[in-house]
Each structure stands twice: as C-alpha cells, then as structure tokens.
C-alpha cells in the first residue's frame, strides 16, 4: 500500500515524533510539502537545522518549536495540481446480440428503511444498466458482490435525493477505479442539469462528462436513448396533472417511464431446406439469410427470402419501469397515448405476439393501490407486475446483513451502548412478517399477477425456457435470535462477559470491580457537569464511523445529537445517514428525529461528510409541510452553500445557511460586541497563519449577524450555550466544532457548568483542536489510521489512533471516542490498549448517553473479545486500494 502512494518514497521509515516542552501539544510537528517530502530532513534533530530551513523555504512557511506536521499542499487544496489529470473514458466493448443471459433484478436500496427508491439492474452478457442510484447503492452492491465497475449506464426515473442520493458517491468511486478511471452515461429528465450544476462544487468535472438530460418533448412519442443490437431503451416523460389554480410544474416534478425492448430471437435456420428445396449452397449466403437479407438461389432462377428457410422468430421481451410518485402523476399516466401500443387484452394471447412481459413499479403503495393506478395496470393482461415501491413488508429483515449482524452482536454484549436496532423490534407486527411464498428457483407460469419485490429478486428475460420470476438469489432472512445463537456458539464465554458489563451499572458492584488493572486506570473522578445528570439530557448516536466511502460494516460520517424533547443536532451527514437513523430508531422514530432537527453542522466539503444532507433536508421539509416551524440552520463550509443553492431548484430544502467561519469564537465575540462577523480562518497567533494565505471573500455582515442571532436563539431553546467552529488541518475550509450545554443546578442547588463536547471532523492533530478541547467532557476525534501508518496519515492529513488520543490527553479531556476508521479495518481497528484508559472506539449505531459516560472506557476490552476471531483486514473490503483512490478523487 505504501508503495502505491503518490509523493512518498518507497522506503519511508516510521516517523519519529519529538517531544516539545515549549508547546502545549506533546508532539513537535511541522508542515511538509509532498513535492519535497523527505523524512531525513523533516524530522532531523536540532543539529541539522540548516536542512530544516531549506525545507521551510521550499514550503513557503516557517517552522517553530510548536509547529506540527501536515500535508500543506493538501490542506491548501493545491495537491490537486500534483495529480495526474484523468480523462475518464467511456468503456467500449464488443456486444453480444444473442445474450444468452438477460434479466432484470431488484437491488434493495431502501427496501427495509424506505429512505430511498429501489434500484433495478438490467443485466446482459456484455452490458449493465442501473435504474436509480439512491443512497446505500454502493454499500448494498459491495455486500452482494455486484461489480459497479461493470455498469455502463445509469438512468434516473426522477431527479431528487430519493433516486439520486447515491449518484455522487458512485461517480467518485468509478472515477477512482483502475489506472485511468471509468465513467458511465448518466441519463435523466431535464432536471438532471440542476443536479449536475450542484455536484460541481465537490465532484471533478471529468467524472460527470457523460451526463445526458432529455425532454420534455414536443411530441408524445417515446424518446429513444439507447438503441443497439442488445436493447432499445426509450423514455416517456410523465408530468403531474395540476388543477387550474395550481401554478404548474416545477423542477423535480418530472418523472419517467422507461421502456426496455430486447430484439427478437431469430428462428432456427433450416439448412436442409435451404440446400435441397431452394438450391442455396453452403457459404456466405447462409449468413446473409440469417441476418435477414434475401439472396439468389445457386441452382434456380429465384430469390430466396429469410422467411423461406428460417423458423418463426420469437418476439423480444419488453420491460417497463414506472415511477409514479403521486396520484397526479397517475392521472397523467392513465391518459398517455404513447403507451397505447404496449397494452394487451385477453384476445391477444396469440403465440408469438409481442407484449410487455414485466412491469417494475417504483411507485409508492399509496399510489399503486389507488383506483386510477389499478385501472391502468389492468390494461396489461399478460404482464408480471413487480411492486418495488415503499411497502411496509418484511421490515424486520435488514438488507445489509453484515452490518446488522454486528449490530445484533454488540446489542447482546452491551445493550446500554447498543440498543436493539429499529429494524428488530421486540414484537413483529403482521405487516412485517416475511412473505410465505416459497423460494423456488424460478417460475414462468401465470405472468398476469402482482407480487411484492424482494431483495435480489430477478425476472429472467433469457433464456426463454426460464423466462419469469426467479427467487434463487433472494437472501435468507436474518433474525436477531439467529445471530445471538451463532455468537454463543462461536464465543461461549461472551454470555459471562455480557453479565460483567451489566455490573458496571450496578453501583454496589462497581466498588469492587475497580480492582481490575484496566478499570483502575480509568478516570473515576466524575466531572461536576455529569453529577446527577438526567438520562434525557443528551445522547450521542454515532451513525457512521467509516472513512471515504460506505463499506459492508461501516457507513460514512454522521453523529446525531439527541436532546430529547428539546430537539436535536446533526454533525456531518454522509451518504446513507437517513437509512442509519431508520436502522437505529425504526421508520416512525427516525421521522420524528428528522422533524426535531434544529441545526446541522458540516465539517468540510468532502463527499463522505455531506452527501446525505439533501435527503435529510428534503424529508424534513416534507414532514413539516403545513406545520408551523422554523427552517433548520445548516452550518458548513462555503462551498457547501453553492451545492445547496443549486440543489434547491430540485427540492425544497427549507433551510438557512451559515458559513462555518462565521461561527468561530471571534465571530461570536463580534456578535456580542455589536461588531462585524470575523471571516479569518485562524485565530491571532496561530502557527497556521503563516501557512495559509486565504484571499478575502466578501461577506454580507448584516445577513450573517441575523443568521447568527437566529442560531443563538435556537441554541438557547434547546438548552445549549455555544456552538463554536474552529479551523483544522485537512483540506481548505475544514473545521471542528465545540458544543457547550447551558448551566444547570446540581443536587445541592448550586449552578454548575454544562457539559462540553468537541468533534474534530477530519484533521491532523493540531493546536487548534487541543485548545478547543481544553477540559472537554467528551472529544470525538478521527483516527483514520493505525499508528504504523503515520506516513499515510501525513499524506492525507488524517490522524493515527495514538495521535488522536494524545490530542485528548494534552487537552485534559475526560472521555475520548475514536471514529472515522479506514475501511481497511472492517470490523475493529488496530488499537493499543496501553494508552487508552479514558478512550473507546466507536461502532455504527453506538449510542452514548451522558449519564453513562463514566462507564465508556470500561467496555473497550470486551470489544476485542467479541471480535477476537475476526481478521484485521477483510478480503471483501472492496480492496483497500479503492479506499485510497477514492480519497485521492476527493
């Protein structure tokens, strides 16, 4: 892995960090440039100061005793110029018109959590087409070994967060595959242009050069998008019917019906008939006849036509994909003239007649069950209908089984920090019981019926002999009891370990259990702010703990701050955040969590930290429609505003934006003093001031101050005193955040300070984080790499495990939680327990109530027992190299 990294010499030795007495930070760290990176000079002793000075001159920055190491060019955003420019070429390959295998398959994004629209894979021997790319598509495909690198085209049935939330991550992943990177054609209605404009703020333009928008058309005829020897794919634009008082269509209203038509299968060539009856000798003329061309007989003065020597052709199958999001769309669908040629009746059951074999309905159940939609479905008498829209069916069986298995194991070991996931309620309702239909391999009888879609359900198109429904790939359902039985069989002593953990909440037993060395090292002095703290004060739910891109076991960054009846906050919002909320709280509980969001804070513009934001905002706007409420405040880096402004042309996001640099301590002080908002990135005296040269950006101080006042009001209403952003070292405009609770009265009536929480975002360890974390109650710090991979941490401006802990130790933090692990550590990262006495590692869906914070480090050794048989690196982690390439694309 080290050998493949750009800018680093093959034989880099492990970095040696020198102690510094003059700095509050325990490490002596200095900036470096990848172009001149040399460990021998970078970490030279004081006797080789001349070489350090030469290095500083090259970097254009000064070094001091309290400087720190980071990748300067990456932090400034200039490292992109060091990378080889990629020209993402479209794949070209020889097609196979016969296509021995062809099928349509349901990819179950959104099937258990209803957070996105389902995706559909149209598979051929040499081509792959995907319809819709909702959030979680990559994660689902990784788990089920569906190679995204084989995808040729992506079609969107609508352009919105529900159908395209996973598209940015998909494009970034494909851009990082292979030597040059790959690109696909992305098709969608005219609204696709708005989405492309929005994504330009954080996705390289090269990754989007093959986006294709279409319609609306002046004619009712289908718009042909793809027409080759394999398949013809056409689009029919669907606009909602509006009443006269309605203002008309708006962006995001357009929907598409996709018509996929396979070519006919030619009849069998009758060699004997051609030779003996029509006098055509074997040779090139046989091929011409089979390709549909007439030829002259070699023995008679006649013209021989293909129909003379070939059996009857079989019509090619037809598949429709219908996304009808509202009943207004359904009314338009019912009256579409362009679909009339595809309708069938009982009188048309002639052998060899062409008809629609399968319709995959992406429409929600509220629409498909309406009288209008049901009447439209009855126009297809020979068609298999697959209902793939949102239905409350099989809800208790998660589609991401790998991560669900880990969640169930953690819940058994420590339910206090890992409550039962929302998809495994204690009692199942009738509508969550699995479909009793047997999983026979395939059935082609009685196509004129409707069935509910399931994960990986197929409709076989070819071979003709097995055309029809195929359930052979549907995964077996997974229940929590099965996972627990499996766990007890593998690790019998885990039952005793679970009982031991329960005793941490037993006050009387806690007096004796401290005798264990590990536990005795934990800080047992409870901070005043946690004295008699109520369980409904604050709970931290870590929704995603992985870096770069979603994996089988870890989703990307998101932290939900639950203030219970007062409201909630969200810190970062990577792809799939809504799905994770629904896995934690259940469908209805997650909706309530989204409703009560008052502020969303985003650390930086990298895609793994914000591409789930639009889906959350759009859903909140929908849930609160018609209810008196205030817009949610989004605090983020300035480039994020460009994305949100462009995206709002598609969906109503109902939000108010505030730049992170307007929420620094200096800006808040300016608000209090009646001055102007501060726009500088680093505080006076920071060593970073000599490194970063930021051009001033004009700010409308009146609007900033107004938004700051609104944020201050929101904080007061939810029981918080401060939300303060501080700059960190990762990429341009990267931030961490401090959140402070309001004062409260303790058990003896005294006013005591509220708790203080700090989140680092993505960052190298730096003095700004140490200062911001001073005496914090809890620090959540990224720990992307294990200690042995310091070179990679430096090159990518991330932290190692020990570096993150050292930040917390230098700041006298009470508890440290490590997160944002490289996906090379699929289940549990490499850790050294010797220096983690007040630290714990995070897992997806981990819930830390402030009343339990004192117990947190005590459970860490038990995690190692739980995962003792697991490999440190996972063979199926979609290649660690992909993690690195994705990071480069960002």
From Swiss-Prot:
Pfam families, sorted: Lactamase_B_4
Enzyme class at the top of the EC tree: hydrolase
Extent of the signal sequence: none
Primary site of residence: mitochondrion
MF-aspect GO terms: 3'-tRNA processing endoribonuclease activity; metal ion binding
Region annotation (Disordered) ranges: 46-67
Keywords carried by this UniProt record: Calcium, Endonuclease, Hydrolase, Magnesium, Manganese, Metal-binding, Mitochondrion, Nuclease, Nucleus, Transit peptide, tRNA processing, Zinc
FT transit peptide: 1-44
Cofactor(s) for this UniProt protein: Zn(2+); Ca(2+); Mn(2+); Mg(2+)
InterPro entries cross-referenced by the UniProt entry: RibonucZ/Hydroxyglut_hydro, RNase_Z/BN, RNZ2-like, tRNase_Z_dom
Documented EC number(s): 3.1.26.11
GO biological process entries: tRNA 3'-end processing
Cellular component GO terms, alphabetical: mitochondrion; nucleus
Phenotypic effect of disruption: No visible phenotype due to the redundancy with TRZ4. Trz3 and trz4 double mutants are lethal.
Reactions this protein catalyses: Endonucleolytic cleavage of RNA, removing extra 3' nucleotides from tRNA precursor, generating 3' termini of tRNAs. A 3'-hydroxy group is left at the tRNA terminus and a 5'-phosphoryl group is left at the trailer molecule
Function in brief: Zinc phosphodiesterase, which displays tRNA 3'-processing endonuclease activity. Involved in tRNA maturation, by removing a 3'-trailer from precursor tRNA. Can process the mitochondrial tRNA-like structures (t-elements). Involved in the processing of small nucleolar RNAs (snoRNAs).
HAMAP family: RNase_Z_BN (MF_01818)
Family: Belongs to the RNase Z family.
Protein name per its UniProtKB record: tRNase Z TRZ3, mitochondrial
Source organism (scientific name): Arabidopsis thaliana
